[in-house]
Regions:
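Hydrophobic h-region of N-terminal signal peptides that target proteins for export
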Residues: 13-22
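Bacterial N-terminal signal peptides that target proteins for export
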Residues: 1-12
Length: 584
């Protein structure tokens, strides 16, 4: 998923962190509910210009989000006002779609209130989500079709020093409060910042769009824009990034905590419980999640053993994995081979989708490698496109050291990130005409990542993937990987596991995973829990529907019931699917 966009969602929800007053009586200026949704959406676009860019709204493409303390305080007041107003509307006065939208708006604000004290510290300094990566991802996602588009890119590069100053002020707040990130995370971010400082503007990904202009832009404009971009890079970006490096190295790192557990911070247990709820949209405790993870690992490994037997292998699951990884052709020979195969899988799957779905998105899909400055520490992910299709959805594939990556798990990965996974779900959501605009942009990890993992299992119902025992084994290995996360994330942040303990558990139950995975859980407590918990809820709903409907069950109707409302918290998803299919 696109990390810059996800961080914007987190920030937007976080600004609801003030006490809630009793809703006031309706006055002459009180807007109706639909108008409130529109006002809230327009406010978010103006307050979070990067979100507007992601959603294909160009009016704020020359700006960055104002992260000064004054702006953050003002947004808190604004969000309190929005919550007061949505609480005014009694559910009995609303139709069903309005009830869902009002409940979702209230959920966004209330959940943000609970998690706000902990979100900034885990988002500002991170090898996956840090502000340094947001700058690059936002520029990469900007349109580059007109002179104005290019001028917007230049304007944003020129304003990077302000972005840096405001974020460094937030890091100073963390130091004062004793809520810094672990040193291991800071060092990873430092490595990325250093790699992003290129000797010349021509070498920087920030200026990629200036290497090839559309034919409609005149030569004189091309020369001017290139000169302006080069000047912005050397006079604004480079000094700001060096300032970031110096601050992280000399000021923040010495204050970074040596412990990796969130519970080592003041109020750490409360923080972790809040983040579990925030990311998973459930009220499960860390202990419950840990036990469930252990149960799921054992169950899935039993299934994996059965697949190995079908392949004629009589040894252990671990031995079969080793055989698949070390056999001739078991790993990739090049980055291009990986990308070509991923594209082929998506092309094979697409014609099969009408068997499982009534509605397919129009948004185009592309596959590209993760950039070299991030590939050593960033997992494969999906970046959403724009509703008008001018920017496709992108599967950003990690092709780092291809000779060390196994082949048998890639089909599941492609299904997760593209179709019928993230691309199908997110693009469909963005194209739902009846949804208020704020809902088209909403992401909740429990639903979105749960759908991605559920989508991996749908390969068994398609006719073009998992044709060999090895690739079905790979799908189960991918599912087990998400179950292992339940154990490891809670092990680190609730049970006090060391980095070495976490890696040892991974090597025992999901061999081949690197320390980069462990470091991801250290940097983002609770987020990795969303995949398995969301998938289990969707599978539970499907079993209930199959049991209740019997021969009348149609998987296309089930998928439509899950996807037709866009992203929902899991409890609200349960209610909506049960109502749509008339099941208990």
């Amino acid at each position: 998923m696109r990390r810059a966009f996800r961080r914007l969602v987190l920030i937007a929800l976080a600004f609801a962190s003030v006490a809630i007053a009793t809703p006031r009586a309706q006055g002459p200026s009180q807007l109706g509910l639909e108008e409130l949704f529109t006002e809230y959406w327009n406010w978010r676009l103006a307050e979070f210009p990067e979100l507007a860019t992601v959603m294909g709204k160009p009016q704020y493409n020359d700006r960055w989000t104002d992260m000064s303390k004054a702006a953050r305080d003002k947004r808190r007041a604004d969000m309190r006002e929005f919550l007061q107003r949505v609480l005014y509307f009694a559910p009995g006065t609303l139709n069903e779609p309005q009830k869902v939208s009002a409940a979702l708006l209230e959920y966004q604000v209330r959940t943000g209130m609970e998690a706000e004290p902990y979100l900034d510290e885990i988002q500002t300094v991170s090898q996956g989500d840090g502000f340094h990566n947001d700058v690059f991802e936002t520029i990469d996602g900007m349109p580059a079709r007109t002179v104005k588009d290019y001028e917007n890119i230049v304007a944003r590069i020129r304003k990077v020093p302000t972005v840096v100053d405001q974020n460094l002020d937030m890091l100073r707040e963390q130091i004062a409060a004793g809520t810094t990130q672990p040193a291991v995370v800071v060092n990873l971010m430092l490595d990325q910042v250093r790699a992003q400082i290129r000797p010349s503007a021509a070498e920087s990904p920030l200026l990629e769009a200036f290497k090839k202009f559309p034919a409609t832009i005149a030569a004189g404009d091309r020369d001017r824009l290139t000169k302006d971009a080069t000047d912005a890079y050397t006079s604004a970006f480079q000094p700001a990034w060096r300032k970031t490096e110096t601050f992280l190295r000399d000021t923040y790192l010495p204050k970074a905590r040596p412990q990796i557990a969130l519970t080592s911070q003041p109020n750490g247990k409360q923080a972790y419980d809040s983040l579990i709820h925030y990311y998973t949209t459930t009220r499960m405790t860390a202990a419950d999640v840990h036990r469930l993870g252990e149960q799921e690992v054992a169950r899935i490994e039993t299934e994996m053993q059965g697949v190995a037997r079908q392949a004629g292998f009589t040894g252990s699951v671990a031995d079969f994995e080793k055989q698949l990884a070390t056999s001739p052709g078991g790993k990739w020979t090049s980055k291009e081979e990986m990308l070509t195969y991923a594209r082929d899988v998506a092309m094979r799957v697409y014609p099969e989708l009408p068997r499982l779905f009534r509605r397919l998105p129009r948004m185009p899909l592309g596959v590209r490698p993760i950039t070299p400055d991030r590939e050593a520490s960033t997992a494969s992910n999906y970046s959403r496109g724009t509703p008008d299709g001018s920017r496709p959805g992108w599967f950003n594939m990690n092709t780092y050291k291809p000779q060390e990556q196994v082949k048998y798990r890639v089909e599941a990965l492609v299904l997760h990130e593209t179709i019928p996974g993230h691309h199908l779900q997110i693009a469909t959501q963005m194209e739902l005409e009846d949804l208020p605009e704020f809902r088209k942009a909403f992401i909740a990890s429990g639903f979105t990542e749960g759908w991605g993992l559920y989508a991996e299992s749908l390969g068994s119902e398609l006719g073009s993937v998992y044709l060999e025992p090895s690739t079905k084994f790979g799908q189960l290995a991918s599912e087990r990987f998400r179950a292992v996360r339940l154990v490891v994330d809670t092990g680190i942040h609730a049970l006090g596991w060391s980095r070495e303990q976490a890696l040892a558990y991974f090597q025992q139950h999901s061999p081949g995973e690197s320390t980069a995975e462990i470091d991801r859980y250290i940097a983002r407590p609770g987020q990795a829990l969303a995949y398995k918990l969301g998938e289990l809820k969707i599978k539970e709903l499907r079993r209930r529907a199959e049991r209740a409907l019997g021969s009348r069950f149609d998987v296309r109707d089930f998928h439509d019931a899950v996807l037709r409302n866009g992203t929902l918290p899991l409890d609200l998803l349960d209610t909506e699917v049960s109502t749509a299919l008339k099941i208990q």
